[in-house]
Amino acid sequence: MNISIITQYSFIVVAIGTMLLAMATGIVGTISILKGQSLIGDAVGHASLPGIILAFMISGRKSSLILIFGAIVAGIVAFILIQIIAEGSKIEADTAMAVILSAMFGMGMVLKSYIQGNPKYQGASQSGLASYIFGQAAYILREDVYIILAVSVISLALFIVFYKEIKVYVFDMVYAYTIGINSRLTSLLIMIITMILIAAGLKAVGAILISSMLITPAVTGLQWSKSYKKVLMIAAVTGAVSAFLGTFISSAVKGFSTGPSIILIMSVIALFSVLFAPRGIVRMLLNIRKMRVGK
């Protein structure tokens, strides 16, 4: 394994992009976990695919900004449809998410197949569009890193500025209402942050795995502490470390994709935490055993 890879420009560009993204998504993902909305990242990620393909079909270009804009628009449409179904029928929100993500991802795959076989789009370069499905950070360019940097900074800035409102909204909606916090606006803010992070991360991780980047670091953080601030710090560090190691492994070992490598490392850390962390399964079983012995 060639350690000198970490000094190469291409590695540094990809590593910076994935680490920034993983830190931001790890922090924001704690909200989805604590609010019981773990599927929302999956729904928005899958639903963004038709937006990306349609943006390419309309513009005829693979500009990252154009494709990200298409992903955000599709994510907004998916969110609105989920809300309409959940509030206007007896269908649960999780079920509505599953229906919408499946339908829109299927639409995206149909559109992708359509442009591949259509002479109208033969002149436009379609290479690299598949990276938005499965993720391939090797395609990340300096422009993409700048976009990820901007999105991550904006997302974290919004999170910090509205930290008090978000924290109260997450843990006690009744109290949030009594002190005048607008729950709808707070929910909308959280959704906007989540959507732009997902859209920015699709090229690196892919629509299929992007939700794992939101959820897995948050799961890890929640196993190690009850303090929300500490959970946020652990989630951010877990995301950054996993992104760096995943990028390094995929660069050093031929045939390893960056996105799946990052998610695999995140999952290993999360599994270890679920088993052995202070709030993990092993500690819980030991505490139960002590209580039984004490009786």
Regions inferred by a protein language model and the residue ranges of each:
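Small-residue-rich segments of transmembrane alpha-helices in multi-pass membrane proteins
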Residues: 47-55, 99-110, 183-188, 192-193, ...
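Helix-loop-helix "hairpin" substructures at the membrane interface of multi-pass membrane proteins
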Residues: 141-217
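Short loop segments and helix-boundary regions at transmembrane helix junctions
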Residues: 30-45, 49-122, 222-234, 252-255
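Membrane-interfacial amphipathic/re-entrant helices at transmembrane-helix boundaries
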Residues: 1-23
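Transmembrane helix-bundle core of multi-pass membrane transporters
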Residues: 97-162
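Cytosolic-side transmembrane-helix boundaries in multi-pass membrane proteins
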Residues: 256-295
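Hydrophobic alpha-helical transmembrane segments
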Residues: 15-20, 68-73, 98-99, 145-150, ...
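Transmembrane alpha-helical segments in multi-pass inner-membrane proteins
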Residues: 203-258
